[in-house]
């Protein structure tokens, strides 16, 4: 079950009006009066333990000839809870993304690529969802990340949502795949946070690079 912090944050989001949040994917403009009023109301922001960066891999920018990961671009880096919500409430959620899109949220200065030194010896847990059914679990995953809810939080690199024709996949990337104790703990906690009942598997990045889709799960929970 998602923890109380995640529930409270989700309820706050649900209770906000459409005017407060803006339409899906719309970047909401501000009048001078609105900006001034907000500046007076928000006197203190709540810093996160880590800064995080959203990355987007646009399907229209992908090419079979291009190197993997060459079309991934950083979108925004945030370091407070308020800045997270400001960005999250004004971007498309997974159900509204185009097929082929990949949206990432990684600790700042860690690129969502196998080649990144922090990710190089890591791996990933993956959850599968029917098309259009991952929005809430994606939000809960983000809240667990930025809220430092994992016991082995230092192992976390970030998360990615992959939108495909028949399904959506959320993957949680970690840095030290060989640390079975840490990886199993992360997998179990992630399932609890999202109230996810199906078995999930952990694949080493090294296996994925060598075997592609033939790579097998090293751990399962």
Curated annotation (Swiss-Prot):
Q: Does the keyword Protein biosynthesis apply?
A: yes
Q: Region entry Disordered: which residue ranges? A: 1-36
Q: What is this protein called?
A: Eukaryotic translation initiation factor 4E-2
| Binding-site residues for mRNA, renumbered to this chain | 64-69, 96, 114-115, 164-169, 209-213
PANTHER family per the UniProt record, alphabetical: EUKARYOTIC TRANSLATION INITIATION FACTOR 4E RELATED, EUKARYOTIC TRANSLATION INITIATION FACTOR 4E1-RELATED
The gene name reads eIF4E2
Q: Where is the composition biased (Acidic residues)?
A: 21-33
Q: Where is this region: EIF4G-binding?
A: 46-49, 56-92, 140-149
Q: Which family does it belong to?
A: Belongs to the eukaryotic initiation factor 4E family.
Cellular compartment(s): Nucleus; Cytoplasm
Question: Which InterPro entries does the UniProt record give?
Answer: TIF_eIF4e-like (IPR023398), TIF_eIF_4E (IPR001040), TIF_eIF_4E_CS (IPR019770)
The organism's place on the tree of life at top rank: Eukaryota
Return the Pfam families for the record: IF4E
Record-level GO BP terms: defense response to virus; regulation of translation; translational initiation
> Where is composition skewed (Basic and acidic residues) in this entry?
1-20
Query: GO CC annotations?
Result: cytoplasm; eukaryotic translation initiation factor 4F complex; nucleus
């Amino acid at each position: 079950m998602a923890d109380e912090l995640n529930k409270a944050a989700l309820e706050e989001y649900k209770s906000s009006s459409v005017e407060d949040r803006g339409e899906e994917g719309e970047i909401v403009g501000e009048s001078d009066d609105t900006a001034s009023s907000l500046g007076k109301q928000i006197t203190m922001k709540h810093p996160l333990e880590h800064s995080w960066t959203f990355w987007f891999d646009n399907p229209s920018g992908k090419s079979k000839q291009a190197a993997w990961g060459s079309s991934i671009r950083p979108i925004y880096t945030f370091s407070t809870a308020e800045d997270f919500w400001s960005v999250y409430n004004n971007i498309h959620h997974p159900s509204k993304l185009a097929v082929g899109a990949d949206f990432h949220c990684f600790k700042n200065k860690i690129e969502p690529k196998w080649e990144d030194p922090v990710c190089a010896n890591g791996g990933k847990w993956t959850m599968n969802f029917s098309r259009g059914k991952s929005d809430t679990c994606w939000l809960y995953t983000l809240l667990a990340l930025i809220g430092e809810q994992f016991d082995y939080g230092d192992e976390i690199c970030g998360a990615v949502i992959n939108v495909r024709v028949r399904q959506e996949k959320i993957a949680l990337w970690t840095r030290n795949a060989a640390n079975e104790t840490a990886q199993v703990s992360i997998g179990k906690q992630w399932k609890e946070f999202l109230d996810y009942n199906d078995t999930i598997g952990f694949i080493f990045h090294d296996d994925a690079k060598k075997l592609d889709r033939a790579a097998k799960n090293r751990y399962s929970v």
